[in-house]
């Protein structure tokens, strides 16, 4: 076929464009009420299904589900014949899949997300979980084998759910009513609900910035409940709206008030369909509920037994894939802004960071780098290729790295003389998304008119890889890639460029005006634009004393506008998309991919598919090195390919706090390399906010300072106090790198979350279930940041209710805490960090300016004994860069009864010596020996019960014993 573009006749590769959706052939298999449209828009009369033709096997069961009565056609056409497959996937994982027997509904292809292989061992008789069902009407519930009499983990029986009808919990939005809880399976609408324990603890179901905090609002204790919409949307970090990614998994932490014990479980609905997920507790109800409302696809559930929170997360990882291996340099400090206008700006920034003694590992560039905002280009004046190459090689010579941005949209050439190979090569290879008629889908983004990659095209990976490689060959010798705008985001509705005169539209003009707006408690009209904490010796703080108010920013009202008609762009059920219509700020839902897939079905996976392609491309371009990738839009299994930053946040104190719940969320989603734009992206940061934020982010996995064009500079060297805070925090971070690296190795090998909510480690302490102003790095490092302006102290809770000793990271003093809220000193430039007892941490003794320099230096070991005098820890060591990971060495540290034993196993040879061993919680010894030989080089500090053994020069490739008596 032909498409007239830009005055040039492009011959498109012939493609068979049949039905624009897999559902188009459903009509012959659907039950119709004979009225066509409109649909009933109500599930009250939906009949549910009846189970029959049951076949059991060693690994589960298969059965047919038949519509139990006249079709209701609530928001689509009822599908009369379904199949249910139940598979005991492993000891801890149960898979329940309900799909149309004709296999016409969209199902996520294995090429996008590889599923676990069919089990070869029978778990049906000893699985942690049991599948129970009623045949008529069909319903199912999941129980624990160990406690079959307890309330089920998931229960779809209407008798277990609150009685209906339930009026709207938002009076202005009729769709927030619950008319009934039948199983509904239609071509454009699926619904299933489960009872939950009253007021139980639910986490996940993102991506979201929830006003309720890390724990989701389930409609009890004064809450209004939750509508979590899953439709990837490129918006600037609003609260209680759908965001960049879709992760329909939740973690339930269920506490038994009778026994005082808690257990965790998890539920994944593996679906890319747009959806609303409701969490609610109706008035006077004794149970809460979760309801899924989907606009396509199938019901593909995985249930995880836990019983610990970390085990649930790991079990989820075993299904969708464990996180990618991170290069060691990725844990360094990254610096970026939209507004580094040329290579000289980059060079000046790097020089200023070094002059201030603030470690800089990675320099980034935003879209300033591009020529006419086109991917895979550099501006010939501001960023000429040879100069960019020279700059990047200067970084590399100092063991530093460089990362550029890649937007999802690809510019369309404007006329016959316009040369842009990524676009024209893509046309030749037929790799761009199309309209239903086969013409190119053309939207508008930064470069002007643009096309979008069709990740289902068999040629897409080679075009993408070549574009990245050519860019690197031109001078942009990247170490990693930053993927942005990949929900995907557009600046117009539908295919607005189809048939347009491309030569009349150039790149969009970026924001060039000065950004206004400062953090709470800074009055720029009174104190000027510096953002300093003091001006002429006077404090600029302007809030009421001890104010801790957190105001909501743009909290949405529920109820997306419903457009009449039932087509792909406007499904009969209108999910609560923050932008309204599904095509707003993104592709139209009938945008068509290879194989006939439409955006309605695959929209939420666009970012994932780009991440996979980019990861594979980097592997090809930088062989034998671990790719480093940070992306905005994510979906289940994205962590195999990328890390994530929390999007376009604000330079506000509230967003400093919201940073924490985002990091905790993405540990659940198996995307542990995550962090926020430190000091905030939108608006101007001030000195105090940036001081506190640089400290906080030093204890999150991904550590990058980034802000918007036109805003005041916020690099950490801009204020003396921020520079000081940064040096202190980064020194602590780099000292802890062996610990961070071990946590991430465990994540890549077994799915264990590196960053943890407090209750993960202390599951039976209900006072911790809502704590999201503190967090744990691993099991042993407790972080308590300042989150409000004008503070010199901070309140924190120390888990363990007095049974655990927590020692200050800096002084090693024991905190006098009993599990209640404790007031800690927190002067400016200080963040409270505490070490758990019964721990042993391998550290870098001398943090260097770069990760390379730090890793080249000696190790130290910090042992924090508990009251019984024991401690335990592990470390994983390898070269930090090879892919696939090469030889490694596993270390264990175990202390008891005055003896520390270091065991070492593996093939990797650790060259650096262990030079210092510090043991906390010991009585003053009279003799210290290593390998049975008494030594003299030790000191003791009475106040902290601290034994320091210096200049040990112990190798870490064999067993070592330290004894104190």
Predicted regions and their residues:
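Beta-strand-rich binding/interaction modules
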Residues: 82, 792-811, 912-931
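Hydrophobic or amphipathic alpha-helical targeting/insertion segments
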Residues: 123-171
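Catalytic-domain carbohydrate-binding cleft regions of carbohydrate-active enzymes
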Residues: 19-56, 60, 154-829, 836
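A low-complexity, Ser/Thr/Gly/Pro-enriched, surface-exposed linker/loop concept
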Residues: 28-69, 78-126
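Fungal secretory targeting signals
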Residues: 1-20
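Short, well-ordered beta-strand segments enriched in hydrophobic/aromatic residues
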Residues: 63-65, 86, 96-98, 128, ...
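Accessory, solvent-exposed terminal regions and/or long lumenal/extracellular loops of proteins
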Residues: 33-44, 51, 60, 835-933, ...
């Amino acid at each position: 076929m032909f498409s007239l573009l830009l005055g040039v006749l492009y011959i498109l590769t012939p493609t068979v464009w049949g039905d624009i959706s897999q559902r188009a052939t459903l009509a012959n298999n659907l039950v119709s009420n004979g009225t066509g449209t409109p649909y009933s828009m109500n599930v009250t009369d939906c009949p549910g299904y009846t189970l029959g033709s049951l076949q059991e096997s060693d690994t589960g069961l298969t059965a047919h589900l038949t519509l139990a009565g006249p079709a209701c056609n609530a928001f689509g056409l009822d599908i009369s014949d379904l199949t249910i497959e139940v598979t005991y996937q492993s000891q801890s994982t149960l898979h329940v899949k309900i799909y149309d027997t004709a296999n016409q509904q969209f199902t996520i292809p294995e090429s996008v997300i590889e599923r676990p292989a069919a089990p070869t061992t029978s778990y049906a008789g000893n699985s942690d979980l049991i599948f129970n069902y009623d045949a008529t009407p069909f319903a199912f519930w999941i129980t624990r084998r160990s406690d079959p009499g307890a309330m089920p983990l998931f229960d779809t029986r209407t008798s277990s759910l609150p009685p209906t009808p339930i009026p709207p919990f938002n009076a202005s939005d009729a769709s927030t009513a619950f008319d009934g809880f039948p199983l509904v399976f239609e071509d454009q609408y699926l619904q299933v609900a489960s009872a939950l324990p009253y007021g139980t603890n639910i986490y996940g179901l993102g991506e979201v910035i929830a006003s309720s905090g890390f724990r989701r609002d389930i409609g009890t204790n004064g809450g209004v409940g939750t509508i979590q919409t899953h439709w990837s949307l490129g918006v600037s970090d609003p609260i209680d709206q759908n965001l960049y990614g879709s992760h329909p998994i939740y973690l339930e932490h269920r506490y038994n008030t009778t026994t005082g014990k808690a257990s965790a479980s998890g539920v994944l609905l593996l679906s890319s369909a747009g959806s609303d997920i409701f969490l609610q507790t109706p008035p006077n109800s004794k149970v809460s509920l979760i309801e899924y409302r989907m606009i396509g696809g199938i019901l593909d559930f995985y249930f995880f037994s836990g019983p610990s929170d970390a085990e649930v997360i790991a079990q989820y990882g075993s299904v969708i894939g464990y996180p990618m291996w991170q290069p060691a340099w990725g844990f360094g400090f990254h610096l970026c802004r939209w507004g580094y206008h040329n290579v000289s700006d980059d060079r000046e920034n790097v020089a200023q960071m070094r002059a201030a003694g603030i470690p800089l590992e990675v320099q980034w560039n935003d879209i300033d780098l591009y020529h006419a905002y086109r991917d895979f280009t550099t501006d010939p004046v501001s960023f000429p290729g040879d100069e960019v190459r020279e700059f990047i090689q200067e970084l590399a010579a100092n063991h530093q790295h460089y990362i550029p941005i890649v937007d999802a949209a690809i510019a369309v050439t404007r006329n016959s003389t316009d040369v842009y190979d990524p676009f024209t090569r893509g046309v030749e290879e037929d790799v761009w998304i199309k309209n239903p008629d086969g013409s190119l889908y053309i939207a508008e983004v930064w470069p002007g008119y643009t096309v979008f990659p069709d990740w289902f095209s068999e040629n897409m990976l080679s075009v993408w890889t070549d574009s990245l490689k050519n860019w690197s060959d031109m001078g942009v010798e990247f170490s990693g890639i930053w993927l942005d705008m990949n929900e995907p985001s557009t600046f117009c509705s539908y295919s607005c460029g189809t048939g347009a005169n491309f030569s009349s539209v150039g790149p969009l003009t970026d924001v060039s005006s000065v950004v206004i707006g400062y953090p709470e408690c800074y009055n720029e009209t009174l104190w000027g634009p510096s953002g300093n904490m003091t001006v002429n010796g006077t404090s600029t703080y302007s809030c009421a004393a001890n104010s801790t108010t957190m105001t909501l920013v743009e909290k949405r009202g529920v109820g997306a506008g419903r457009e009449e008609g039932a087509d792909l762009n406007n499904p009969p059920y209108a999910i609560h998309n923050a932008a309204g219509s599904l095509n707003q700020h993104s592709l139209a839902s009938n945008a068509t991919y290879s194989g006939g897939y439409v955006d309605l079905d695959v929209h939420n996976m666009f970012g994932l598919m780009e991440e996979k392609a980019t990861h594979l491309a980097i592997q090809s371009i930088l062989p034998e090195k671990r790719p480093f990738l940070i992306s905005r839009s994510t979906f289940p299994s994205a962590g195999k390919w990328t890390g994530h930053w929390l999007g376009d946040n604000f330079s506000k104190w509230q967003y400093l706090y919201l940073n924490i719940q985002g990091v905790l969320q993405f540990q659940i989603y198996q995307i542990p390399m995550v962090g926020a734009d430190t000091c905030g992206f939108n608006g101007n940061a001030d000195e105090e906010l940036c001081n506190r934020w640089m400290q906080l982010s030093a204890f999150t996995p991904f550590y990058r300072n980034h802000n918007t064009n036109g805003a005041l500079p916020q690099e950490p060297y801009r204020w003396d106090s921020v520079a000081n805070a940064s040096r202190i925090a980064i020194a602590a971070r780099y000292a802890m790198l062996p610990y961070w690296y071990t946590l991430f190795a465990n994540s890549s090998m077994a799915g264990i979350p590196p960053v943890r909510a407090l209750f993960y480690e202390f599951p039976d302490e209900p006072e911790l279930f809502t704590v999201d102003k503190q967090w744990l790095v691993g099991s042993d490092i407790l972080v308590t940041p300042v989150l409000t302006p004008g503070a010199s102290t901070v309140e924190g809770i120390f888990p363990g209710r007095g049974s655990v000793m927590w020692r200050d990271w800096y002084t090693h003093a024991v905190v006098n805490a009993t599990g209640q809220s404790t007031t800690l000193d927190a002067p400016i430039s200080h963040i409270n960090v505490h070490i758990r007892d019964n721990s042993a941490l391998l550290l870098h003794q001398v943090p260097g300016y770069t990760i390379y320099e730090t890793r080249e230096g000696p190790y130290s070991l910090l042992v924090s004994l508990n009251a019984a005098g024991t401690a335990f820890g592990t470390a994983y060591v390898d070269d930090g860069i090879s892919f696939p990971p090469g030889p490694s060495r596993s270390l264990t540290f175990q202390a008891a009864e005055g003896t520390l034993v270091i065991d070492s196993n593996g093939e990797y040879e650790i060259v650096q010596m262990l030079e210092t061993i510090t043991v906390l919680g010991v009585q003053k010894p009279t003799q210290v020996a290593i390998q049975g030989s008494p030594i003299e080089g030790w000191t003791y500090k009475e106040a902290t019960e601290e034994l320091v053994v210096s200049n040990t020069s112990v190798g870490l490739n064999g067993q070592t014993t330290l004894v104190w008596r």
